[in-house]
Amino acid sequence: MKKIAIIGGGAAGLAAAIATGNELVRLGAADECEIVLFEADPERVGRSILATGNGRCNFSNAHIDPACYRNTDFVEAALRSLARLSGVSEWGSAQPVGAYGASAQGSAQPAGTSEAPGRESTQSASVFEAPVQRFFSDLGLMWREEGEGRMYPAANKASSVLDVLRAALDVSGARVEFGKALSAIEAPARGKGRFHLRFSDGSIAHAEKVVLAVGGRGVSAVDTSSVIPCELTRPVLGPLATDSRITRQLNNIRVKCAVSLERSGSLVAREEGELLFRDYGVSGVCVFNLSRFACEGDVLSIDFLPHMSAADRDAWLFARRKHLSARLGGNGQIAAEDVLRGAMLPQVAQVLCKCAGIDPARPLSKKDVLALSRVIGGLRLTVRGIGDAKQCQVSRGGLSIAAFDPQTMGAVRASGLFAAGEALDVDAPCGGYNLHWAWSSGLLAGVSAARSAVSADGEGEGE
């Protein structure tokens, strides 16, 4: 009996195991192969899923665009390949077939009144979204769509996503071995036979087909040198450390703003949203997204009034100075702290004044107004690096995508080896994109591994 090993019981690994089992059943080969999922956690699979989306699990996005991903062309090719496997046309129509095998009726429910309505059917989903939506619809998950296309389970708890995955895993035919952290993988002799899997507890396993879904941090701990090149990973999608002389004065204060990332005077990227000041730097979704591109020495420019042009901001401050001076009986004289009162928190106003070289308690001159306006539109912080690696949601690096075929997720020069999820050098911004990639690549790798195990030549070509 051939063995298919799934390494890692996170999002990608669970999707791969379920898809492998489903495809073997569809091919009438469930009795010919053994599926074993090796999970590093000593007790359970999917623990990492419970922490996503602040415990709510932003499991996908309703507007998936491959351009949002690192290594865009590879991701687009993989998503299109998965769509073809699941019977999705270019416009998301047609009934699902193959490993997904279920209708998509009633897959989503409307959200609350403050949210955009969720999809009532996956028929309206695009070629990039439909396969994942159909997969979860088949498992019985109900969801809703919130702002910016973020998709959450209707139960509003990450555990509901894990519950349907674990139920599907139970009937997939996969056997789970816990406490198995992979330390090395060795290729079959002369390219034929079984892969040798070495684990940190000293045990060894063998498998004809292997799906590596160990995550970004996990892949760095695996010696893959005999089968595939692997780049060291570094944490991204997290807070940034900056010059803390400014940020420590604003620790734990949140502001709505726009943040631009600049390098050598040129714009690298820009994000709008909520920013959280920390004693070591800055955090928040907009910062997390910029961290994917940030390098030490770059500059973050924070615009506290992003919907005003520089001229409008100047005019606003002059008009505010004039109005409040008359209102407060200042005879044309009013301090900066009075002008900013009601528009910004006092701590923020104090820091902005200090950065503009203004005494917040002294009358605000015309020159001071212009200086303050410039700082409000561009408080500058120098990036020192990642602020807290433990908060980072993904890793940059891992297995080189050049070594894999996006049509199958199979290794080009190591037949029988597949990879999925964050183990590959693919990452995306916040909003459900990274989990969407985990499910998608896991499903594609699982189907391909099953077909490879069953096919006469073992190459796993699509039917």
Identify the residue ranges that each predicted region occupies.
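Short hydrophobic core segments
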Residues: 5-7, 38, 182, 204-217, ...
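A conserved short coil-to-beta-strand element within the FAD-binding core of flavoproteins
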Residues: 178-193
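A conserved FAD-binding loop/helix module that cradles the flavin
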Residues: 425-454
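Glycine-rich FAD pyrophosphate-binding loop
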Residues: 5, 21-54
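Glycine-rich active-site loop/strand segments that organize a redox cofactor
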Residues: 53-92, 124-148
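Beta1/beta-strand and adjacent pyrophosphate-binding region of the FAD-binding site
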Residues: 1-12
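An anion/pyrophosphate-binding glycine-rich loop and adjacent beta-alpha core
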Residues: 42-43, 50, 59, 63, ...
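A glycine-rich dinucleotide-binding beta-alpha-beta segment and adjacent secondary-structure elements
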Residues: 178, 350-427
